[in-house]
C-alpha cells in the first residue's frame, strides 16, 4: 500500500469497503503524533444469504494484522463510536477484530472517545469491556483539542430520525487539515456544516447506504446528494466510502458526483493508489468463481482451516485487483 503524504502529515487508510472490509479505519502521522482512528473492522455477516467468502476473510486477516501494528505505534487512538466495525470487541465473531489481539500492547497510548453520557446502552457495555480489558480509562474527547487533534460534539449516526445514536468527528491539522467524519452517511446537515467550518483539505467520510433502499427514503437520498455536493465544492480531496461502497449503486453515485466537480472525489482505495476491492458487493461472484465447501466457515471458526488457498486462487483469477498491493 501507499501513503498519502503532505509535508508533515501522512494519511493511511487501513480498512474500509473499497479495500475489502467494513470499517473506516485510518492512521494519521504528524510531526509529534501518530493517530489511529476507529481501530476495528468487520465483514458483512450475511449478504445475499451468503457468509463471507474465504478470500474476503483472507483480506480481513491481513488488515487486522495491520491494525495491530498501527496500534503498537500509536500515540493516540480515537474511537468515533462503539459499533462492531469500528472497535476491538470482547465478543467478536470470527471476522471482527478481537480485543485479545491488542491486550497489553502499547499500554501508554491515549484513547479518546465520546463522552459517557452520549453512549447508547450497547455502547456502554462495550466501553466497560474495553476499559476493563485494556486496564485504562477512555478520555472524554467531545469538543476539546489536544495537539493536532480537535473533536466534534456528537453528531447523528445517519439521519437524526433514523437512529438516535451518535458519532464523534475528528479534525487533524498539520500543514493541511484532515477530517474523519465517521458514520454520518451525509444525512445530517449540521454535521456537514461543522465539517465545512473546520475548513478541511482532505475529508474521509461515510456515504449513504444506497445498498439498503428500504432503509433510505427518497428524501434522505436527495439530502445525502445535496450534502455531498456541498462538500465536493469546498473540499479539495473528498474520500467517500464505508456504507456507500457496499454495492455498485454507490460506485455509480460516486462517479456521478466526481463528474460534477473539479475537486478530487474518490474512494479509499483510490486515495491509497491501489485497485478497488469491492468484495462485499461482489460476494455472489466470489462464490461462483471460487466455490466453497460446506462446513468451511464452521471449520474456520474452530481454527481447523485457513485462507491461504483462496488468497492464492484469487491472485490468479482477479489479477486486475492486484491483491498483493493490499498486503
List the model feature ranges, each with a label.
Residues 157-198, 202-261, 268, 273-275:
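Internal alpha/beta domain cores that form substrate/cofactor-binding pockets in large enzymes
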Residues 45, 87-88, 213, 248:
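Glycine/Thr-rich phosphate-binding loops of Rossmann-like dinucleotide-binding domains
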Residues 34-35, 76, 202, 237:
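Short, Asp-centered acidic motifs that coordinate Mg2+ and/or phosphate
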Residues 38-43, 81-84, 113-117, 200, ...:
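Short loop/turn segments at strand-loop or loop-helix junctions that form parts
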Residues 33-34, 105-111, 233-238, 262-263:
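A short helix->loop->beta-strand "cap" motif at the edges of active sites that frequently abuts
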Residues 51-109, 198-204, 211-212:
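Active-site metal-binding motif and surrounding structural segment of the metallo-beta-lactamase
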Amino acid at each position: 500500500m501507499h501513503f498519502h503524504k503532505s509535508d508533515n502529515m501522512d494519511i493511511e487508510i487501513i480498512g474500509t469497503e473499497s479495500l475489502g472490509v467494513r470499517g473506516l479505519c485510518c492512521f494519521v502521522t504528524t510531526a509529534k503524533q501518530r493517530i489511529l482512528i476507529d481501530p476495528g473492522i468487520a465483514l458483512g455477516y450475511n449478504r445475499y444469504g451468503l457468509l463471507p467468502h474465504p478470500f474476503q476473510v483472507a483480506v480481513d486477516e491481513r488488515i487486522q494484522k495491520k491494525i495491530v501494528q498501527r496500534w503498537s505505534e500509536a500515540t493516540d487512538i480515537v474511537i468515533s463510536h462503539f459499533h462492531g466495525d469500528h472497535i476491538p470487541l470482547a465478543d467478536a465473531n470470527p471476522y471482527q477484530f478481537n480485543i485479545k489481539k491488542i491486550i497489553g500492547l502499547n499500554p501508554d497510548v491515549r484513547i479518546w472517545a465520546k463522552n459517557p453520557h452520549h453512549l447508547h446502552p450497547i455502547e456502554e457495555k462495550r466501553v466497560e469491556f474495553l476499559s476493563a480489558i485494556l486496564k485504562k480509562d477512555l478520555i472524554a474527547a467531545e469538543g476539546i483539542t489536544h495537539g493536532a487533534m480537535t473533536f466534534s460534539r456528537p453528531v447523528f449516526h445517519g439521519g437524526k430520525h433514523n437512529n438516535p445514536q451518535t458519532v464523534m468527528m475528528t479534525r487533524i491539522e498539520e500543514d493541511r487539515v484532515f477530517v474523519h467524519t465517521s458514520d454520518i452517511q451525509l444525512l445530517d446537515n449540521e454535521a456537514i456544516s461543522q465539517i465545512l467550518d473546520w475548513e478541511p483539505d482532505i475529508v474521509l467520510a461515510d456515504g449513504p447506504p444506497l445498498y439498503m433502499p428500504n432503509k433510505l427514503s427518497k428524501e434522505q437520498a436527495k439530502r445525502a446528494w445535496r450534502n455531498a455536493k456541498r462538500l465536493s465544492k469546498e473540499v479539495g480531496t473528498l474520500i467517500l466510502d464505508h456504507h456507500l461502497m457496499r454495492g455498485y449503486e454507490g460506485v455509480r453515485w460516486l462517479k456521478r458526483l466526481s463528474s460534477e466537480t473539479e475537486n478530487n472525489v474518490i474512494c479509499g482505495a483510490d486515495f491509497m493508489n491501489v485497485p478497488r476491492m469491492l468484495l462485499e458487493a461482489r460476494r455472489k461472484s466470489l462464490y461462483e468463481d471460487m466455490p466453497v465447501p460446506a462446513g468451511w466457515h464452521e471449520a474456520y471458526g474452530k481454527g481447523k482451516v485457513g485462507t491461504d488457498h483462496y488468497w492464492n486462487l484469487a491472485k490468479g483469477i482477479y489479477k486486475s485487483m492486484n491483491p498483493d498491493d493490499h498486503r
